[in-house]
Structures are given as C-alpha cells and as structure tokens.
C-alpha cells in the first residue's frame, strides 16, 4: 500500500528529528522479488542538535521558586541532545512537582518551550515559559492558584450526590478532622478510615496524597471501589477545596465449595471443603474465615 508506506516514511523521519537530528531525511527503497515487495527505509540522520543554553521565563515568583529549589532533579542540562521526549519528561516532572504543592488545576500544557537555533551551528538556545491560567480561550488569563483542603468528607453512599441529597439528611461523625456521612449503618469504623486516608484538612492539595489514598482504600476488602473528587468552595475567588471520598460497599459474604481428591491407604475418594468468608465482621474490613 503506497499510502501506508509513505505515511511510515513520514513517521520515521519525524521520530528521528524529535531525537535531535533536525535535518534527518528518510529515503524509501523498494524491491520486488517473487511477487513479494520488500521495503527498506534508509535513514540519513546527519549531525544531532544540542542545547547550548537553558533559560526560564516564569512570571510567577512562587512557581519559579519551586522550580529553582528542585532544579537538581531536572532532566535538562546544557550540552544535552535536543530530544523532544526529554523536554516532555521535564514538563511532566514540573507538573507533578506543582500538583504536589497545591496547584490542583495545573497541567503540563501551561509549560511551553521556545527553541532558537544558533546561526551556523548545530546548537539551540532553549527557553521554558509558563503560560497564565486560562480554562477557556474566552477567559481572562489569571495567575495559577494554590489550593488548600478545607474539609475531607467520607460518604458511605457513592450515589449520594447523584440523588441530589443534602449532607444534612445523613448522620455524621467527626473523627480526627474527617467528616464521615452515612445512612442507617456505618459499616467501617472511623479510625479505620482515618488510618487509610492521606488527604489532610488545612494542608495544601497534594496529588500524591490522592493516589496514596486510592491505593490504601483499595486494600479494604469491605469496599467494592472508591472514588475521590474535589469541589471548590467558591469557583470565582476561593483557593479552598472540599475532598469527597465516595465509597461503594462490597458484598460482605461469600461461600465457596471445593471438591478435593484424596488418596488414603490406597483408597481413592473425594472430600468436600467448604469456606465461608465475612469480609467486614468487625467493621475493620477484616476477613473472617
């Protein structure tokens, strides 16, 4: 297929150039032998471009300070190949750094590069720029907000918000800074939820805390799954978030029946083995067998 062949040629050339070989060319050579077509792609890489100088244009003193203090972990350094994948890894690294320091709405698209080639050389001067926060094109650009957690709410009914119910309609317990809302029966002890939670009230939002909570809650066998979302207190000017941990209860009981082959004193027979499990008998998500 000539279209597929040409498309592959373009993709290979693009990949090689993204590795820093900016003047690379890919030549196509085809051979027909015994009704079979053999395609060879010949890469003329040329000399790779390297980064001569790195600069940062970060028009936010707080964010600039975070980047500078963590510069020892940067993937960028002068003399490195001008490799697009490394540049993207650096954007991901800084994004993760900021998301773990309160920047709940930050993503890597707010970081862009400007690369200027140095005349008569195979070098580029690289500048990383920070774009202002802008959710939609028609929005006025603003500074990036640093969010703190106001409340951490544990909700034992995962469809509570979907039904349009108010939190006031549910029983609640306050435990170690957490607000636990339930109806009819609280099937997990408050201290268990506190022990498995990493999101802390009055602290900066940290994406790692969210992931750690997902991992930790996933070990509670009393739960089928957990969903965590965040709501802004005031979308216009607030920098506070409420964390909502929505829990879906798993089935408490299971019954399994196994047939085991036995061979005692030369007699081949069968023995029945029955196992009964209650996954939350003590409301601590224990398994009782």
Spans of features found by a protein language model:
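Residue-level signature of outer-membrane beta-barrel architecture
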Residues: 278-280
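Short, intrinsically disordered, charge-balanced linker/junction segments flanking boundaries
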Residues: 287-289
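Periplasmic polypeptide-binding modules associated with outer-membrane biogenesis and secretion
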Residues: 1-263, 271, 275, 285
């Amino acid at each position: 297929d000539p279209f597929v062949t040409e498309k592959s040629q373009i993709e290979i050339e693009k990949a090689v150039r993204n590795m820093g070989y900016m003047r690379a060319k890919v030549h196509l050579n085809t051979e027909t032998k015994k009704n079979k077509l053999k395609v060879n792609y010949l890469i003329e890489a040329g000399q790779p471009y390297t980064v001569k100088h790195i600069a940062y244009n970060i028009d936010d003193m707080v964010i600039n300070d975070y980047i500078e203090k963590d510069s020892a972990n940067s993937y960028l350094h002068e003399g490195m190949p001008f490799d697009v994948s490394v540049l993207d890894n650096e954007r991901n690294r800084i994004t993760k750094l900021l998301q773990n320091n309160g920047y709940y709405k930050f993503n890597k698209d707010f970081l862009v590069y400007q690369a200027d080639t140095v005349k008569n050389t195979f070098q580029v001067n690289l500048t990383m720029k920070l774009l202002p926060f802008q959710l939609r094109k028609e929005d006025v650009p603003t500074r990036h907000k640093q969010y703190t957690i106001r409340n951490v709410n544990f909700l034992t009914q995962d469809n509570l918000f979907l039904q349009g119910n108010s939190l006031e309609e549910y029983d609640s317990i306050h435990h170690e800074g957490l607000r636990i809302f339930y109806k009819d029966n609280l099937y997990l002890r408050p201290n268990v939820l506190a022990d498995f939670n990493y999101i802390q009230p009055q602290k900066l939002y940290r994406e790692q805390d969210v992931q750690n909570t997902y991992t930790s809650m996933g070990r509670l066998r009393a739960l089928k799954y957990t969903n965590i979302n965040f709501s802004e207190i005031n979308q216009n000017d607030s920098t506070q978030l409420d964390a909502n941990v929505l829990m879906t209860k798993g089935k408490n009981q299971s019954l399994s029946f196994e047939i085991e082959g036995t061979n005692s004193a030369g007699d081949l027979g069968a023995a029945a083995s029955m196992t009964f499990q209650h996954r939350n008998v003590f409301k601590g998500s224990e398994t009782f067998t």
